[in-house]
C-alpha cells in the first residue's frame, strides 16, 4: 500500500469510559484510510494510567505504525503536539484529536493536492463539527472557498484572518520543517493558540490551502475536555484579551510565556 510521508500526531492526556470508545473510533479512522500514514505517534503522559492503557491497546492493522511517545513535560494539547513532532521521522505530519475522526479519503486527497500544489506547506480539511453525541453543528474552514473572502480562492491569508477567526487546525497536514522553523504551537496562548498559529504562518508567507473536501469530524467542546473546562472559567473580558493578544504575539516565532494574570 502506498505511503504518504506523513506522521499522525495523536495527543492523549487522559481517557475514561466516555472517551475510550471515541479513541477507538479515532484509531479506526486511521486504519480505514485509503492511503496510509507512515507513523501513528501517540503522545501520553509518562508513567500514567493512560500510558499503560495505550501500551495494552489492540491497534490491529495499525500496530506497525504505532509509536508511543511518553512525555514527562506539560500535558496541555500544544505541548503534547510539539513533543510528538519532535520524534516524528517523516517530512509531513498531521494532528488527530483522540475524540475525533478522519474522513476515509483525507490522506489520499492530501497526496493528490500536495502533488498538484508543490508550493503549499499547510493543508487544512473542511471540518464537520458535531456535538458530544454526534449531532451536526456546522462546518469549519470552508470560508476560503467563498468569492472575495481572501486574495486567492482556497488560500488562507493574513488579511482574511485578521477579520475572521473561525478556523480549525485539526486534521491539518503541514511540512515538519516549516512548523519547526516558525516556532510550532505556543502553550501559553491557551484560548487562541490555533488562531495565533495561523496568523503566524500566514504572516511568514506560508501558503495555507483548504482542500475543498470533507476531511475531518470534530467533536466541538466536548464536556470534560481540556478546552471546554478552560472556557468555563473565562469571563468575556479575558476572552477578548486572548483574541487581541494573539494579534500581537504572532510576530514572535517563540512562545513568550505570556499569561492573562501577568498582563493585568
Model-derived regions, located:
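Short, acidic, metal-binding catalytic loop of nucleotide-sugar glycosyltransferases
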Residues: 25-37
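Glycine-rich, basic loop-to-helix element that forms the pyrophosphate-binding segment
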Residues: 71-88
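Short aromatic/hydrophobic "clamp" motif used to bind/position activated sugar donors
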Residues: 93
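Catalytic beta-strand/loop signature of glycosyltransferases that borders the donor
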Residues: 126, 209-215
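Short, flexible, basic/aromatic active-site loop/helix in glycosyltransferases
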Residues: 142-164
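Catalytic core of nucleotide-sugar-dependent glycosyltransferases
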Residues: 214-221, 227-259
Amino acid at each position: 500500500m502506498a505511503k504518504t510521508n506523513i506522521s499522525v500526531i495523536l495527543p492523549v492526556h487522559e481517557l475514561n469510559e466516555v472517551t475510550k470508545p471515541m479513541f477507538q473510533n479515532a484509531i479506526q479512522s486511521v486504519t480505514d484510510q485509503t492511503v496510509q500514514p507512515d507513523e501513528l505517534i501517540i503522545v501520553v503522559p509518562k508513567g500514567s494510567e493512560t500510558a499503560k492503557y495505550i501500551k495494552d491497546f489492540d491497534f490491529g492493522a495499525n500496530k506497525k505504525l504505532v509509536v508511543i511517545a511518553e512525555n514527562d513535560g506539560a500535558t496541555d494539547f500544544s505541548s503534547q503536539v510539539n513533543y510528538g513532532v519532535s520524534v516524528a521521522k517523516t517530512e509531513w505530519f498531521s494532528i488527530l484529536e483522540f475524540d475525533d475522526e478522519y474522513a476515509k479519503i483525507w490522506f489520499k486527497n492530501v497526496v493528490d493536492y500536495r502533488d498538484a500544489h508543490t508550493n503549499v506547506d499547510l493543508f487544512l480539511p473542511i471540518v464537520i463539527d458535531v456535538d458530544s453525541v454526534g449531532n451536526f453543528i456546522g462546518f469549519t474552514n470552508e470560508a476560503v472557498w467563498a468569492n472575495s473572502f481572501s486574495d486567492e480562492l482556497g488560500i488562507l491569508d493574513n488579511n482574511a484572518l485578521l477579520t475572521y477567526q473561525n478556523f480549525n487546525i485539526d486534521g491539518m497536514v503541514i511540512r515538519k520543517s516549516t512548523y519547526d522553523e516558525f516556532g510550532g504551537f505556543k502553550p501559553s496562548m491557551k484560548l487562541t493558540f490555533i488562531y495565533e498559529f495561523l496568523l503566524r504562518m500566514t504572516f511568514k508567507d506560508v501558503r495555507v490551502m483548504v482542500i475543498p473536501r470533507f476531511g475531518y469530524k470534530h467533536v466541538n467542546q466536548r464536556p470534560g475536555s481540556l478546552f471546554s473546562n478552560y472556557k468555563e472559567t473565562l469571563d468575556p473580558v479575558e476572552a477578548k484579551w486572548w483574541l487581541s493578544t494573539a494579534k500581537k504575539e504572532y510576530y514572535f516565532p517563540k512562545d513568550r510565556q505570556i499569561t492573562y494574570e501577568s498582563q493585568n
